[in-house]
């Protein structure tokens, strides 16, 4: 959450969890901890409330069924699905996929072998493998155009790529060493 707030000026962040008390407590804690970013962080009453008029929808769940109604996603939204990394799990409602202008992954090969968010709709004939355009790297390198207009719905599916995790860990390690933080094991 903090990374998103640091990267982009967000006015309002709605959070939803099936456990209402946990959701409320998390929203309150994040409102205090992340106040410097100026966003209002509030618990949503349900997943539909959470995505209503949302420009950015981020799902981070281990769900085996969709966590929001894909027909309610507004034009121009970006959806980032982080939680489903197994073929039987899908937090993304397949109903949004035919409306999506672009479906991008961290790794197309990994996503097409690991996430039910794509495998289930492909098996059901809702989309094809060709509808999955490529990787985020392809967007960054200009092989695939990013957002081309304010009406596009863009879906980003991430299953995790070990090489990216290692690079991130190395950057964090180097910064910790430079700042004199942490400790060395075995010394």
Locate predicted features:
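Rossmann-fold NAD(P)-binding glycine/threonine-rich loop
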Residues: 73-75, 82-145
């Amino acid at each position: 959450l903090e990374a998103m707030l640091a990267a982009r000026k967000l006015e309002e962040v709605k959070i939803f969890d099936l456990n209402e008390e946990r959701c409320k407590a998390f929203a309150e804690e994040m409102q205090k901890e992340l106040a410097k970013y100026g966003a209002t962080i509030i618990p949503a009453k349900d997943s539909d409330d959470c995505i209503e008029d949302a420009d950015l929808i981020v799902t981070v769940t281990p769900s085996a069924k969709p966590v929001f109604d894909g027909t309610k996603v507004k034009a121009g939204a970006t959806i980032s699905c982080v939680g489903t990394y197994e073929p039987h799990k899908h937090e993304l409602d397949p109903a949004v996929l035919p409306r999506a202008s672009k479906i991008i992954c961290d790794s197309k090969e990994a996503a097409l072998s690991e996430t039910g968010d794509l495998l289930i709709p492909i098996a059901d004939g809702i989309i094809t493998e060709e509808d999955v355009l490529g990787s985020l790297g392809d967007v960054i390198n200009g092989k695939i155009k990013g957002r081309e207009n304010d009406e596009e719905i863009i879906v980003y599916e991430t299953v995790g790529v070990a090489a990216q995790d290692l690079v991130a860990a190395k950057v964090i390690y180097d910064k910790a060493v430079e700042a004199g933080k942490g400790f060395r094991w075995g010394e």
